[in-house]
Amino acid sequence: MTVSCSKVLLSLCLFLMLLKATHESNQQRTNFREFFEIQLAQETREINEKNNQPLNQQLPQLNRRKRLWRDEDRRTFCTTLCPCEDRRKRAAVTPPTRKVPCCCP
């Protein structure tokens, strides 16, 4: 009976050691996975910031260009000869979407 008890205790100790080693291995894997995910997120953020820098620098210039085109279109449309009058006139702030020039009432 003593031999069988010691075998059971030895088996139990080996099982507990194996369980502890498995738990530590799983913990290391989890830690590595979390570290890898954090590192990947940082690299992705750095790449996005690097790629967005030229766009952020160009945005004010693009907005200005867009505004100039819009103003130029309005000026061109509104300084055309008005069919209701025989002279050129600057427009009010009517959008140039109507069939008649915006300088006409």
Swiss-Prot record:
Cellular-component GO terms for this entry: extracellular region
Subcellular location: Secreted
Processing and modification events after translation: Contains 3 disulfide bonds.
Signal peptide: 1-21
Tissue expr: Expressed by the venom gland.
Top-level taxon of origin: Eukaryota
GO-annotated molecular function: toxin activity
Species for this entry: Scolopendra mutilans (Chinese red-headed centipede)
Name listed for the protein in its UniProt record: Putative neurotoxin 9
Keywords: Disulfide bond, Neurotoxin, Secreted, Signal, Toxin
Similarity comment text for this entry: Belongs to the scolopendra neurotoxin 10 family.
